[in-house]
Amino acid sequence: MTSLTRPRVEFISTILQTVLNMGLLSLGLILVVFLGKETVHLADVLFAPEQTSKYELVEGLVVYFLYFEFIALIVKYFQSGFHFPLRYFVYIGITAIVRLIIVDHKSPLDVLIYSAAILLLVITLWLCNSKRLKRE
């Protein structure tokens, strides 16, 4: 087995980084399209006369924020020199669990467990934003 030379390792790293960047750029564009579709869907739900449309509107808003947060995560990745900040994943996790509570709130025990998960994520966010762990 031959060992890789430094220039060859850097070349492979550059190729893989380019593939990753192109994939994330493609994902970002797809998410922008979905964000546009969700905007149209929210406008339809907003003017729907049914009573159930209120829950659908709130669920749609949370899904909208999930798309928005994923797009913001991709933008931050490129702005911060190809690095994903941990706190953005925590924001996405909190929003996703809030959406889950809104959609599936039949079992009080499940809602309590989801709420505990949100509390754990908020504590994680607090720790990530503390002076010792903050990178930016």
From Swiss-Prot:
Transmembrane segments: 15-35, 55-75, 82-102, 108-128
Coiled coil: none
An individual GO BP term: cellular response to phosphate starvation
Cellular localisation: Cell inner membrane
The UniProt record lists the keyword Phosphoprotein: no
Membrane topology note: Multi-pass membrane protein
Top-level taxon of origin: Bacteria
GO CC annotation terms, alphabetical: plasma membrane
Record's keyword terms, sorted: Cell inner membrane, Cell membrane, Membrane, Transmembrane, Transmembrane helix
Pfam families cross-referenced by the UniProt entry: PsiE (PF06146)
PANTHER family on file: PROTEIN PSIE
Homology family: Belongs to the PsiE family.
HAMAP family for this protein: PsiE
NCBIfam families in alphabetical order: PRK02833.1-2, PRK02833.1-3, PRK02833.1-5
Protein name per the record: Protein PsiE homolog
Organism: Enterobacter sp. (strain 638)
Lineage, opening ranks: Bacteria, Pseudomonadati, Pseudomonadota, Gammaproteobacteria, Enterobacterales
